[in-house]
Amino acid sequence: MAVAAGALPAADLFAQGTTSDVRGAKSLRAHAQLRGLLVGCAVVPGKLHGERDYADLVGAQANILVAENAMKWKALRPAPDKFDFRGADAILAFASRHGQKVRGHNLCWHEALPDWFAGTVTKDNARQIFTEHIRTVAGRYARKLHSWDVVNEAIDTKSGRPDGLRKSPWLELIGPEYIDVAFRTARAADPKALLTYNDYGIEEDSAEQTAKREGVLQLVQGMKKRGVPIDAVGVQSHLSASDPLPGAGLREFVRELGRMKLQVFVTELDINERKVEGSVAERDAAVARVYKDYVTMMVAEPNVSAVLTWGITDRYTWLDAPKYARPDGQPQGCLPFDANYEPAPAFFALRDALDSRRSNEQ
């Protein structure tokens, strides 16, 4: 394909930097801070304290962190009468040393429940166990966290329920009011953290995702009408480089949340390139384009205040698990840094997108 004079081929559009271009004032966190934004990633405590390159990268690039797994029930509750906060505490300690905020993830989800759950929790004791967990965990970190994902992934439009709620252990054991209970209990335990509902598959304008997005909106509207304390909605943003880019539907959703005085966080951003063909450079360019266009669209909305990726380096990504891996077996390039901790084209695309937000100094 012919390229205009002075233009770069598609594969080179975002391949314009080296490691020296990404630290200090050139880091993601520095660019975000100038624009009143938070930028960060999901982290693993063992790697923060056991892998120097990983820790250095996270410390340099992020001004907000979220635990990938360390704050989920399965990690925190080794036994019905025992809590284990070591991993979560380690993340907060790292963040404190590096001037970073922390998001809590999550207080209620239908997955990542401990092995003892099914044989212990019944309709008679579920509400007590549920509220005790939220009070204990949110209370331990009260006034220390930026926000909590209080309820995660509660909507499933294929459930057959008129309210669109996912069929989950919490719905079965407590009933649909479990969501209100979770948010009210979290607010009582921590009056300062921004209480968030978080979900996936609500970004695109397909019929399925449009319906789910409407389900989330109806859930949040109902909560507001009932006086349930909610401050934000998390849009997970597990996107695909081979799918149509999110557009008008998501933009209007974000704006409607803004009219409800709710913030929006991009909470788990990564770009799956398993179906993208071509060279590594071409695949990297396709991923970078999605980062640039998607984040630019999102941060153009004033109530979008944080962008977090689900990991920071391709060395550690869930998208290389067999269920999501490329058919050709090649590793995915889905995050801002490659497997060798070098900045990928996605890094520069993300940084450019953050720069598109009106600066605090303008």
Task: For the regions a language model picked out, list residue spans one by one.
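Substrate-binding cleft and catalytic face of glycoside hydrolase catalytic domains
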Residues: 22-24, 28-29, 64-78, 87-203, ...
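Glycoside hydrolase catalytic-domain groove-lining segments
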Residues: 93-101, 173-198, 209, 213-277, ...
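Boundary/entry segment of secreted carbohydrate-active catalytic domains
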Residues: 19-61, 68
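N-terminal export signals
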Residues: 1-16
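Aromatic- and carboxylate-lined catalytic core of secreted/periplasmic carbohydrate-active enzymes
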Residues: 286-310, 314-318, 333, 337-362
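Short, acidic/polar
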Residues: 46-60, 128-137, 210-223, 290-297
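Short, solvent-exposed turn/loop segments enriched in Gly/Ser/Thr/Pro and often Arg
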Residues: 43-46, 106-111, 149-154, 270, ...
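Acidic-and-aromatic substrate-binding clefts and catalytic sites of carbohydrate-active enzymes
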Residues: 19-21, 42-53, 73-86, 155-157, ...
